[in-house]
A protein has these predicted regions:
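Domain-scale detector for complete catalytic domains at protein termini or as standalone homologs
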Residues: 45, 75-81, 87, 126-127, ...
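An anion/pyrophosphate-binding glycine-rich loop and adjacent beta-alpha core
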Residues: 4-105
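A conserved FAD-binding loop/helix module that cradles the flavin
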Residues: 168-196
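A glycine-rich dinucleotide-binding beta-alpha-beta segment and adjacent secondary-structure elements
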Residues: 89-169
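Gly/Ser/Thr-rich beta-alpha loop segments that engage phosphate groups in nucleotides
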Residues: 26-29, 141-142, 165, 172-176
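Predominant activation on well-ordered alpha-helical scaffold segments within soluble catalytic domains
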Residues: 30-31, 112-115, 119, 181-189
Length: 203
C-alpha cells in the first residue's frame, strides 16, 4: 500500500508484481500507485507485504518450521527458503536481530519483529522518476472541452485532440494505449470527414 506521510492516510492498495531495482521500486503495482502519489507534493511511504499469500498466523508457523530445520545455524543462514537471497540482509537489518545469533536462541519477541518486517516492509519515497521515464503523464486538455463523438475542441473549431493531449490517464495494463489508439482514430476520421464536407470553391 502507499500512504501519505503528511496526511497520515492510505492513498492506494493493490496486489500484484513489484520489482526492487538499482534505482528504487518499479513494476505494475508501483506504476499504478504513482498515479496517486504524483498528484500530491506530500511525502509518501510504500508498505510492502513480502508474503501476501500468508496471513500472520500461517507465516509465523512457516518461520517456526524453518527455524526448527536450522536451529543450530546463524540467523543469517536460516532464511534462504523464505526470502530471495538479495532481500535477506535487508530484512535482517530491519528486524533488529543479530545476523550471527543462533536460531535456537531467538526469542518469541524477535520472531515477531521478523514477521512484522516481512508483512510490512516500509520504503519511504525519496523522489519520483523523471518525466522522461514516465509510461503516461497526467494533465492536459479537459475532456469537458472536447466533443466525445468527434474529439473536436468545443472552444476552437477544427482543432482535434487525442491520446496524452487529453487530461486522461489510466492504470498500467494497456488502457492508456487503447485510449491513444481509439481517440486518435476518432480524431483522424472526424477531421477527414469534416474536410470532405467543405464546399468546393466557386470557379
Amino acid at each position: 500500500s502507499a500512504a501519505s506521510d503528511v496526511y497520515k492516510r492510505q492513498v492506494y492498495e493493490d496486489f500484484g508484481e513489484l520489482l526492487f531495482t538499482h534505482f528504487g521500486l518499479s513494476g505494475p503495482v508501483i506504476l499504478s500507485a504513482s498515479a496517486h502519489m504524483a498528484r500530491g507534493e506530500a511525502g509518501y511511504t510504500v508498505r510492502i507485504d513480502l508474503k501476501p499469500a500468508l496471513d500472520e498466523k500461517t507465516l509465523d508457523a512457516r518461520i517456526l518450521r524453518d527455524f526448527s530445520a536450522a536451529q543450530n545455524r546463524d540467523f543469517e543462514n536460516s532464511l534462504s527458503a523464505l526470502l530471495p537471497r538479495s532481500m535477506i540482509p535487508v530484512v535482517i537489518a530491519r528486524s533488529g536481530i543479530d545476523p550471527m545469533q543462533k536460531v535456537n536462541s531467538i526469542t518469541k519477541q524477535q520472531r515477531r519483529a521478523l514477521l512484522e518486517t516481512i508483512k510490512c516492509f516500509s520504503v519511504p519515497i525519496a523522489c519520483k522518476a523523471p518525466v522522461e521515464d514516465a509510461i503516461v503523464t497526467s494533465g492536459g486538455v479537459k475532456v469537458s472541452e472536447v466533443n466525445a463523438k468527434t474529439m473536436e475542441s468545443k472552444l476552437v473549431q477544427g482543432l482535434y485532440f487525442a491520446g496524452e493531449l487529453l487530461d486522461v490517464d489510466a492504470y498500467t495494463g494497456g488502457f492508456n494505449l487503447q485510449i491513444a489508439w481509439a481517440t486518435g482514430r476518432l480524431a483522424g476520421l472526424s477531421a477527414a470527414a469534416k474536410e470532405f464536407q467543405k464546399p468546393e470553391d466557386a470557379t
